[in-house]
Amino acid sequence: MTKKAIISVYNKDGILEFAKELKNLGYEIISTGGTMKYLKENRIDVINISDVTNFPEILDGRVKTLHPNIHAGILAIKDNEEHVKTLNDLNISTIDMVVVNLYPFKETIFRENVAFEDVIENIDIGGPTMLRAAAKNFKYITVIIDPADYGLVLKEIKENGDVSFETRFYLATKVFEYTAYYDSMIFNYFKYIRGDKSFPDYLTVPLETVQKLRYGENPHQQASFYKITLPFIEKSNIANAEQLHGKDLSYNNILDSDSAIELLKEFDEPTCVAIKHNNPCGVASGDNIFEAYKKVYNSDPVSIFGGIVAFNRKVDRQTAEELKKIFLEIVIAPDFDEDALSLLSTKKDLRILKLLTLDKTDVYYDVKSVNGGMLVQEKDRKLLNEDYQVVTERRPTEKEIEDLIFAWKVVKHVKSNAIVIAKDKMTLGIGMGQTNRIWAVEHAISRSRFDLNGAVLASDAFFPFSDSVEAAGKAGITAIIQPGGSIRDKESIDAANKYNIAMIFTGIRHFRH
């Protein structure tokens, strides 16, 4: 019996050669619409699918393949006598191969100012239906969604007379992989257009491979990097960054770069951020990025070694000359002067990343994996309220308020328990990841290379006891910003008054785990 293949593709890469080879191997080709026209124009004999269904394409092509004569031929179990008898009674032929790829939904939703009607018309219905039917019946049918698999299928047919069970299973798996991804894009796009910010009962995220990584967090762990393919998430992310120079990014590089970019988004004035092991080891703002970088370097010249440095302004030659003096894994910026890029590129292993933007628009969920599930929450975008409360006898000066706001922006991005000490919009000491707050305070104080008189302190959560304020006062710190909310707040306020410290309660906590 002559084998039959249905070919209906939007992406026509390689399809002419594949169809010609199938014809040479004795297959009949059934096709639809644009694909049929394309094959015929290139002198490939095909059967119009309407001749199989005995029904015309209708509704501007919305209904072409949705017919029992097609789907019975795809779904029939070929060694089931009842199925075979039914097909014979109804004069329906079995289908041996389905070659389909889908309307460009992803490309459509990424078009600027795309009309919603165009989005709707690019939701493929008949294609996924045929693909899923064929993938379900993979024991008997070969299904191809990816043009990259044409060669594999032809090779097996030529060598073995048919496609192996293992390959059919592999190809069917690819179909369900892609159709799930395709449907996830549709679901998320519809949810966004409706303005629905609720947490759904069933959450799917459309993820596409950016790169296969050499390894994960450690060399014995395999890893890959995926990006969310939705048009409404922030463009300012590590997945969209353009690599201008250097080795491929590692798993840890990507984590640290993400932390650097997210912290940079807090600042409008020229700012430099240094990240090590997913924590800031130095942050500073200045009149220009050269000044900001020098402040960051001077705040902790040890930890910055082998770290990541990121800027929210174009990198100039003067700054590049300073960066070149030390070993860094990555330099990130919105742009680089030509001579700055040339200079940094002399370090062959240095990864140089250019950000598309540093916008703060709608964001997708913040997602963390746990064994057996995922935790999903809103991004922590809470800003400092202007109605923060001064709870001490002394009010902070204007300069202290500027430094307090600076430190508050930084502490939000430090692992809890987190303390940031700052002065002149420059971090002096950062205490991170401690299991109690006084240790975080002591850690931040001990790490400072500078006199802390006149410095300010930010805490990501309230002080459970007054000991942290006592330690800050003894170190010369003159202002504190913290959420407040402890049952012992009065003890901390009394300690602040004792040392003439101005203290602000924000009412906002910024835990980070």
Swiss-Prot record:
Family annotation (InterPro entries): AICAR_Tfase_dup_dom_sf, Cytidine_deaminase-like, MGS-like_dom, MGS-like_dom_sf, PurH-like
Entry EC no(s): 2.1.2.3, 3.5.4.10
Keyword Nucleotide-binding: no
Catalytic activity: (6R)-10-formyltetrahydrofolate + 5-amino-1-(5-phospho-beta-D-ribosyl)imidazole-4-carboxamide = 5-formamido-1-(5-phospho-D-ribosyl)imidazole-4-carboxamide + (6S)-5,6,7,8-tetrahydrofolate; IMP + H2O = 5-formamido-1-(5-phospho-D-ribosyl)imidazole-4-carboxamide
Gene Ontology BP terms: 'de novo' IMP biosynthetic process
Keyword Transferase: yes
Pfam families membership: AICARFT_IMPCHas, MGS
The MGS-like domain, residue ranges: 1-145
Molecular function GO labels: IMP cyclohydrolase activity; phosphoribosylaminoimidazolecarboxamide formyltransferase activity
Record's comment describing the protein's domains: The IMP cyclohydrolase activity resides in the N-terminal region.
Family indicated by similarity: Belongs to the PurH family.
Name used for this protein in its record: Bifunctional purine biosynthesis protein PurH
Gene from which this protein is expressed: purH
